[in-house]
Amino acid sequence: VTDLIPRQVLFGNPDRLSPRLSPAGDQLAWIAPHEGVLNVWVAPITTAEGADLAAARVVTQDTDRGIRFFGWTHDNARLLYLQDTGGDENWRLYDVDLDTMQRRDLTPFDGVQARVVASDRKFPDQILVGLNRGNPKLHDVYRLDLITGELTLDVPNPGLIGWVADAQLVVRAAVKPQPDGG
């Protein structure tokens, strides 16, 4: 009789996943469990050998479902991450300031799903996000000021499903499926 693979091995949380180097190359972030829930950790890179894992700190404090999607802002000062509530897939976009550890909900809308559309290092204080505020099936593009948190409608969605932005954070193309799904 072959031993079964334990469920924890197949479905449990990984030890570490999604490593991301900061834009300045001086910090490493990754997702790992904290008190049994996946959160984002950050460690300084202090030597040529790599990050000082003993100095790692948890920068998010999720106690429920865990965090799976995150990224650095281009100013090296903050991390962005997506989080839903109870598996509803209405993702909110949050940031955490790595100096103050202050967290902000950048898309505080009930029943709305946020998606990061584009960011660019030439615009470290801005990103484009898709929000389905007006129609649950369509994500309009908003420009988000990462300093003030202000959202400005950039491009309304006329019935497309995706966007392509250039390096100037200007939406240049849209993606729409064919009637046959192709």
Name the predicted role of every residue range.
Residues 1-16, 43-68, 73, 86, ...:
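Multi-bladed beta-propeller domains
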Residues 8-41:
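Beta-strand-rich domains and repeat architectures in extracellular enzymes and scaffolds
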Residues 23-24, 74-75, 121-123, 167-168:
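Residue-level detector of Asp-centered blade-edge/turn motifs that repeat once per structural unit
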Residues 25-28, 77-80, 126-127, 172:
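Hydrophobic beta-strand positions that form the internal "hydrophobic ladder"
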Residues 36-41, 88-94, 136-142, 180-182:
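Structural motif
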Residues 69, 113-124, 164, 170:
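A structural signal for short, hydrophobic beta-strand segments that form beta-sheets
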Residues 167, 174-178, 182:
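Cationic-aromatic interfacial patches
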